Amino acid sequence: MAESNFVDYVKIYCRSGKGGRGSTHMRREKYCPNGGPDGGDGGRGGHIILRGNRNYWTLLHLKYDRHAMAGHGESGSKNRSFGKDGADKVIEVPCGTVVYNAETGEYLCDVTDDGQEVILLKGGRGGQGNSHFKTATRQAPRFAQPGEPMQEMTVIMELKLLADVGLVGFPNAGKSTLLSAISAAKPKIADYPFTTLEPNLGIVSYRDGKSFVMADIPGIIEGASQGKGLGLRFLRHIERNSLLLFMVPADSDDIRKEYEVLLNELRTFNPEMLDKQRVLAITKSDMLDQELMDEIEPTLPEGVPHIFISSVSGLGISVLKDILWEELNKESNKIEDIVHRPKDVTRLQQELKDMGEDEELDYEYEEDADDEDDDLDYEYEEEDWEEK
């Protein structure tokens, strides 16, 4: 079977650059034999930077590029010349990318906006040259400050799609059919469970040039929050939706029970999901007459806007758009920042195994050769970097 192009989970080894060393150069000129120290400062090591890019919507471009390394700062030189800063390594990621420490599960950062930049790992600061250490009693210091060490970390990048409306339902509930009917998205549609194996996004056009984004999430089954079916892999994409459209087919044995099972799966995965506004759509309603709709109406969940629709015949689609637009524009339904919690280490290891990301990514590298300007023997004098 062909490998999916939708990648929403990768593990990457990141390493910032180390700072360049300060120079110990002594000024030696024809008419200035005792010119004193003139060693320059070392350059800053390169940062590891994450940048949001709306042109990406998966992490596929990172799947086969698992090592991100910034350049080292160059050493200072004579005439108090600063060393060149190391090149930053910029990692382009889709908006909605969350980053965790792969070893501890600690939450690190969240990139949500196009062009947003986050420094994941800072490069080491350059060391001070010997010109900084000249004093009244120490006219020719033969030492300089070493550059600050680099930082390295293996991280997990996890994508949570940004959409206004998330479609929630069991397999074959008609989610993909609805998305294809009201947007230009063309998800695969077939009459068997789990036709949709990855999320699909569609832009739904509304009146007066207005629009909103809808996400078709692969079908949930009872026990998905414990890993059954497609498991919790795609449940995280619902976290960023400001409104959830629950879809239950009209031929379901018990519409209310099916809705409550879906609700319970979301509650188990993340209780905060229940704070989102919900709308219930009874799909495939072209098989119902008005009398049957009237009989079903009293059995539906209270306090949840509901509508009978058919994506094939167009029944209720226009009204559904009105309901969704109205709910989306309520102040209480604006997308809020997600509270990201650290991952449990034990569950993290199992998660990495399930996602096929349990391979070690440590990187072997060679130390740079010593490129000092002179051959003087000196000892580094460690400085308190925090007070520099």
From Swiss-Prot:
GO molecular function: GTP binding; GTPase activity; magnesium ion binding
GO CC annotation terms, alphabetical: cytoplasm
Keyword tags: Cytoplasm, GTP-binding, Hydrolase, Magnesium, Metal-binding, Nucleotide-binding
Pfam family, one: MMR_HSR1
Record-listed E.C. numbers: 3.6.5.-
HAMAP family per record: GTPase_Obg
Function: An essential GTPase which binds GTP, GDP and possibly (p)ppGpp with moderate affinity, with high nucleotide exchange rates and a fairly low GTP hydrolysis rate. Plays a role in control of the cell cycle, stress response, ribosome biogenesis and in those bacteria that undergo differentiation, in morphogenesis control.
The protein, known as: GTPase Obg
